[in-house]
Design a protein with these regions (language model features):
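Short alpha-helical "recognition helix" segments of helix-turn-helix
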Residues: 30-38, 45, 256-263, 289
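A short hydrophobic beta-strand segment most commonly corresponding to one strand
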Residues: 123-127, 181-183, 196-219, 343-349, ...
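Conserved double-stranded beta-helix
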Residues: 208-247, 422-460
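Recognition helix of helix-turn-helix/homeodomain-like DNA-binding domains
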Residues: 39-64, 77, 265-281
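Short, conserved beta-strand element in jelly-roll/cupin
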Residues: 127-132, 144-166, 206, 349-353, ...
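Short acidic-glycine-tyrosine-enriched beta hairpin
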Residues: 113, 165-188, 194, 335, ...
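A short, N-terminal "cap"/entry segment at the start of jelly-roll beta-barrel domains
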Residues: 69-132, 235-238, 283-286, 291-352, ...
Length: 460
């Protein structure tokens, strides 16, 4: 009988083999073709595909020399959360403590909270060691960063000043207290200080990647900066956003304006005005233009709201409700978010004890959860038909994979950040288009793209 380490290694080998088979299918290489081109035996290729032998670095290096593929294509994501949930205790967080100086003085104490190789979070517990005596945005004791690539949701504990550059590149300061929250976009310079000399302020700085991480970022970096930058359209207003989308889709179809006019019966002057952001198109115009470009109308629609790059949400302005509707075990408090990231949701959840054995949640997003209360809570969940339980102490943090059935029992308070990563949205729509029948092959390829024995197609 295999131990857990051997079982995990076996699963990783199988996934690696399925990934390798997917690459061969995409390149239209049969196993025997790959064996001949890589200079190895068909038996070894078959063992790799079947998950019985490791795909060696030597074979990968040969492959990238003869095929139009990248080294990263051959590596699968290591799953460090095999039961669907990962926990980091408050004590483990404390052991990761490091002091970071700015201008030669202690400025922040950083501590890790739970992270997973399969999740987009990079969350930190940060204590503000710099204390200020005023709320001036120009305070020279506040040492600014240069902004960073990741999106950031922040939950505030204690008296903290939050400094940031607004859209007009003016320094601003928000006076934050426990329960307040904010969202900040990538590359916006910012910093934090404490206002209370008796007790340093604290933040949960939950940074995370969205759609531009991983392969997308690599694809952009494979282009020149000049070429890659042109994918960034002007979304500064609704009119400019709409105009940029209309022009982009027309140009990638190599359609002259007069041809679009013929197809849509929209006057050329009107199309020119729309592409110059003179006005927003009507719903009927969007439908006609979408048909002429052979796209869905959603591709041509500007966002309903042009959100600010920094969203500050005082606790007393947050909406509240109870969930589930009947039992009302949880009080939800809606924290800072932005419509620009529709699959990012932040909440404070007040848990009220229940004897119910029901799993109250099944969420199709990655979840970071931090126990900000004073009481321990019980987390119950189910994964692959097995039931699990963990005690969540104050200061503990947990990661929960998407679609895990779970609940919390006890009386306490949690901060929860849910994010989509790279799957919800366009990737989800594409997977839905492929359909449930083919989902398994889309995730992990299980067969060659054709049957060499010419068997009849099984459509059942």
């Amino acid at each position: 009988m295999m131990d857990k380490q051997e079982e995990s290694r076996s699963k990783e080998l199988i996934k690696s083999g399925q990934n390798f088979l997917g690459i061969l299918n995409d390149l239209k290489r049969r196993p025997e073709d790959a064996a001949a081109e890589l200079g190895i035996s068909l038996e070894e290729i078959t063992q790799i595909i079947d998950g019985k032998k490791i795909l060696s670095q030597e074979i990968i290096e040969k492959a990238v020399k003869i095929w139009p593929v990248n080294i990263s294509d051959f590596y699968i994501i290591y799953d460090d959360t095999p039961t669907g949930v990962k926990l980091m205790s408050a004590e483990e967080s404390k052991m990761s403590s490091r002091i970071m100086n700015r201008s030669g003085k202690p400025y922040y104490e950083y501590r890790d909270t739970v992270m997973s190789s399969v999740a987009p979070f990079r969350p930190e517990w940060i204590m503000e060691l710099c204390q200020v005596e005023d709320n001036n945005s120009e305070n020279t004791d506040a040492k600014w960063n240069n902004g960073h690539f990741m999106h950031q949701f922040t939950y505030f504990i204690g008296n903290v000043n939050f400094y940031y550059l607004d859209e007009n590149y003016k320094k601003q300061v928000s006076i934050m207290k426990t329960g307040d929250s904010m969202y900040i976009s990538p590359f916006v310079p910012h910093t934090f200080t404490s206002r209370n000399k008796q007790s340093n302020g604290l933040i949960l700085a939950l940074t995370y990647g969205n759609k531009l991480t991983g392969d997308v970022k690599q694809e952009l970096s494979g282009l020149s900066i000049e070429a890659g930058s042109q994918f960034s359209l002007d979304f500064s207003t609704k009119e400019k956003s709409s105009a940029s989308l209309l022009k982009f889709h027309r140009e990638i179809s190599s359609l002259p304006i007069n041809e679009v006019s013929i197809r849509t019966k929209i006057p050329t002057d009107t199309i020119i005005d729309l592409e110059n952001a003179k006005r927003l198109p009507t719903h009927d115009e969007i439908i006609l233009l979408a048909r002429s470009y052979n796209v869905n109308s959603r591709e041509l629609m500007a966002d309903d709201k042009i959100e600010k790059k920094v969203v500050v949400k005082p606790y007393n302005e947050c909406k509240k409700w109870y969930y589930p509707e009947n039992s009302k075990i949880y009080e939800f408090v809606e924290l800072a978010s932005t419509p620009s990231l529709p699959f990012s949701k932040a909440f404070e959840i007040n848990v009220q004890n229940s004897d119910s054995m029901d799993y109250d949640f099944k969420v199709g997003l990655h979840q970071f959860i931090y126990n900000v209360g004073e009481n321990e809570l019980l987390l119950n969940w189910e994964f692959n038909d097995k039931k699990y339980t963990k005690l969540i102490q104050p200061g503990d943090s947990i990661y929960i994979k998407p679609f895990i059935k779970h609940n919390f029992r006890g009386n306490g308070k949690l901060v929860v950040l849910r994010v989509g990563g790279r799957i919800p949205g366009d990737s989800q729509r594409e997977l839905s288009l492929i359909g449930k029948r083919n989902t398994k092959r889309a995730i992990n390829e299980t067969m060659q793209w054709f049957d060499p024995h010419g068997k009849k197609l099984d459509i059942h």
